[in-house]
Design a protein with these regions (language model features):
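A generic structural motif
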Residues: 100-101, 140-146
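An amphipathic, hydrophobic-aromatic interaction surface with interspersed Lys/Arg
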Residues: 135-142, 154
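DNA target-recognition domains and sequence-specific DNA-contacting regions of bacterial/archaeal
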Residues: 13, 18-137
Length: 185
């Protein structure tokens, strides 16, 4: 990944969202008041715009199925968009976006495109319904076959991650002995 990846040296194409992704309502949709065991390991995803949409972690919920891992969630009323790596439960009005090519990195790239698309929706009369999502259009970089370039999107986001980590390490790394903390005695 030493080669500089640029968004500007790519061809881009408009895709109909519902033709590129399987979009469906969540499998669980549990009202928070009905949750049992609030000390578990399963993420409970809501329409919140913080913490990757995770409201809390819960135990297995008898009578409900988890949504599968490696998907993107969209909160209908709030237009929140997040990648979910483990299986999870959700609150109400969450849509689940699937594509077998998704991974942690290209999903982050796609999320940015989705956010550009859903920002036109609003709470109330013009929300992000399933029909509107399926008919919507997003632009993505393409490969030589005119298909989404999943590899480029992954590599691009990996590079962003590495650059961010490098900056964080450089920021926190002591530059000389005077900057190091010393203990009292």
């Amino acid at each position: 990944m030493s080669k500089k990846l640029k968004l500007t040296d790519r061809e881009w194409k408009e895709f109909v969202f519902g033709e590129l992704f399987d979009i469906s309502s969540t499998s669980s949709s549990i009202d928070k008041k009905r949750l049992t065991g609030l000390q578990g390991n399963n993420p409970y995803i809501t329409r919140s715009d913080t913490n990757n949409g995770i409201d809390c972690f819960i135990d297995h919920q008898p009578g409900f199925v988890t949504d599968e891992a490696n998907v993107i969630t969209i909160g209908l009323d709030t237009q929140t968009v997040f990648y979910q790596s483990p299986p999870f439960y959700t609150g109400q009005n969450i849509q689940v976006i699937r594509n077998p090519n998704l991974n942690k990195y290209n999903a982050l790239f796609v999320i940015r495109a989705i956010k550009m698309f859903v920002k036109k929706f609003s709470w109330g009369s013009y929300g992000a319904t399933l029909t509107r999502l399926r008919k919507g259009k997003i632009f993505l970089p393409i490969d030589t076959n005119g298909e989404p370039d999943w590899t480029f999107m992954s590599d691009f986001m990996k590079r962003i991650e590495q650059e961010t980590l490098r900056k964080a390490i450089d920021f926190f790394k002591p530059r000389n002995d005077k900057q190091m903390l010393t203990g009292g005695g």
